[in-house]
Amino acid sequence: MRRYATILLLIAPLFAALYLLTLTSVHTFDALSYILDVDRKPWRELFHPHHLAYGPLGAGIRLAALGLGWQGSAERLLQATNALAGGLGVGLFAALLARLTRHWQAAALGALLLGASYAYWYYAVEVEVYTIAALFLIAALWLMLELAQRPASVPGSAVAHVPPGGPAPSSSHRVAARGATRAQLAAGLGLLQGLAVLFHQTNVLLSFPGLVALWLGLQATPPAASARWRAALALLCAYATPLTLVVGGAYLWVGLGVSGFRSWEAFFGWVAGYTTTGYWGGAVDGAKLALLGQGLARTIAWPGGALIGLALLMILALNFRRLGRAPRGVLSITLTWLAVYGAFFIWWEPENIEFWIASLPPFYLLVVLAAYPPTSGQPLPRLGPALLLVSALAMLPINGSAILRRGDATRDLQRVTATALAAHSAPGDLLIVPDGVLELYLPFYVERPQAISLNQAMIATGAWPAACAWLHARIETALSAGYAVLIAADAIRPLPAPPGEPPTPAERMGLDPATVAECYAPLQPALEPLTPGPGLPAYYRLPAAQELANGPGWDFTRGRWGWRVTGAAPATSSQPGWALRPESDPTLISPPLRLEPARFTALEVRLAADTAARDAQVFFLDGNGQADEARSLRWRLEPGPAARTYRLDLRAAPGWEGVITGLRLDPVSTGDGGTVVVEWLRLAP
């Protein structure tokens, strides 16, 4: 055991150092979500149903770091945690291979295969759940193999019971009485799987190879027929009890205690999470199989993963018969593992490399054992180890350079775009961006918290008509508060996924570009083109209220610009502008402004009215946003329904002084069934 611990202590720090030296500065959507959650949310809101433990773990790490004087985001803390877990996982895998093959070369090459795999390496330098989960899975794999080979000890004897005609006990069997019992191994397996499930819910799938390991443990030295079922039940309980306590206890505590669900329907809806959306899963067709090939290749290496994967499969094919001499349980446990995880993720999302990390340890275990089979002193075959060496050595520079490129913020289009958008916006402005990581880059990197996307709108509402209304409400809220709105051209008309790539969120939701563009059609007259920078995606802009006040004013033939109306109903008119049917005390109130009285000499307004009432009034809102007769200007409308331009002299107007935080226009004093159309309003210097 000391030998294996030495291998672990040698390998783990090497790969942990490699990961720490290659930490990414370009994050995935999920990674930024975790970082922002840990940085900003209270601990009660950190329990994601699909990876229940990761948010609280991050919060605990950040809290401990703050106590030691750490300042800033949890970003690097969480990355360092993943890097250390990744290194420990590689070291543990190397120790397992040394235990099974008795070859240090096999252990070293297996460690290099796992540690240099693109998916494993990338998620060891990112803020994601998969590396920590993989550590528990590797430890669980070790226990499953131990359990499959561990016989029951006979009371009063130092060695295991040997069935009549059976082989002599191996050295591992002879120490069974001194080592862990089958029940202890089963309990350890249940505990490790429970922890893996808390870091990613899909690791409930490990129960299938786990049950195979339990069955093999029973078969290693079958108990007497009369006690067989009792022994099986005891072993199953030893495994299931910690698994149930860890997983069931955690979910019940969070769901019923922390989150406060008061019905089982709500609780199970929360636990099911993404599975209820319909965006993932579905029939396995040719397109999914093509994405499967892409996902598996990129899991191993990017680029060149397909070629290296074929080389590894060749090692398996050429030496598969030799796997028959592998330690008991290796084939049945690993093949069950690969079949179950593979079937689920082919159905769920085959192109996503993060989901294939869980299948790397059993796959590489088979490959290494095929290249380094137990030989009983016979010389090793040469082709397998040589091909394995070439493959492993090729993965290191290929994936290392790819990860460094991907993690370089200066090469990241989304980071460059976020920085450029910050230069064209204020912190309170609303930014509607294409689906993807940009909606998180903006709040995290450039302090633009009001960033939303089509995907966010659909999640908030559940259906496209409601999502469209939600988007318009957010736009109106921003404009009414005096802020600008920036809308990506690709958000107005979402681009389809490139050939061979996974469908976009809009495509998953069944939304075509024309349908989305129709939602933004009412805004088109008011949109102003904006180019954030050379070579960057195009945007459109709805200017902020202050910008319009200091510039061209408000053209109501193009939009409402955040002005609010009270005491009037919408109307129709053949004349251009904002048509209203006045009721009692009709008013139009501007967004918040900061007007300098000395800067403007007149207020010009063009409007038409066919009402009997012809008295109009404009108020200059005080520092509290309140209107007062003493801070207003009255005038009478010209006779007739035609539109007229009125120029009001502000130089001697009552209240046109001091702090002015907005305008209120009363186009007429009261309604009488007629219509008022306000065409435009501006402040003249």
Regions found by a protein language model. Give the residues of each.
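Transmembrane alpha-helix segments characteristic
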Residues: L10-L14, L109-G110, L310-I315, R321-I346
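Membrane-interface alpha helices of multi-pass inner-membrane proteins
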Residues: G110-A111, L185-H200, G342
